[in-house]
Structure formats: structure tokens, C-alpha cells
């Protein structure tokens, strides 16, 4: 199945784009997606520190991703 990935902040710089279509297996969870992204983009090795939102709602690692979902990869925010 196919999902849309949106990258924000440093994630955009690491991947080299701010959005892309991405294929995942049916019944994949957020943790499955993280493993796949690390495998395909070694620059995202610290993705476990990032927040993940699916269809504009923050998601836990065990959430099953549905076909056509919009998944945002949001790095930690720092500053003051």
C-alpha cells in the first residue's frame, strides 16, 4: 500500500525533500515504518526521537497505518 510522508525541520534536510509517496506492507505499524525508513534513509537513525503524526494526529508505535494515510515526521523542537 502507499502512504504520503511529510518531513519537517531537520528531517527535510536529512532526506532531501519535504514530501514523498512511500510504499509499506499492509497492516504496518508506526514501528514497522520507522524500521523501514531507517533501512532506506540511514540519516534517520535517530527517528525514535521524532514525533510521528498520522492524518494530523500524533501516533503511538503500535498504530496500524491505513492505505493513503498522510504521515508526518516531526523532529524534536528546541530553542528558547
What residue ranges belong to the model's regions?
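Ubiquitin-like/PB1-type beta-grasp interaction modules and other compact soluble beta-rich domains
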Residues: 1-78
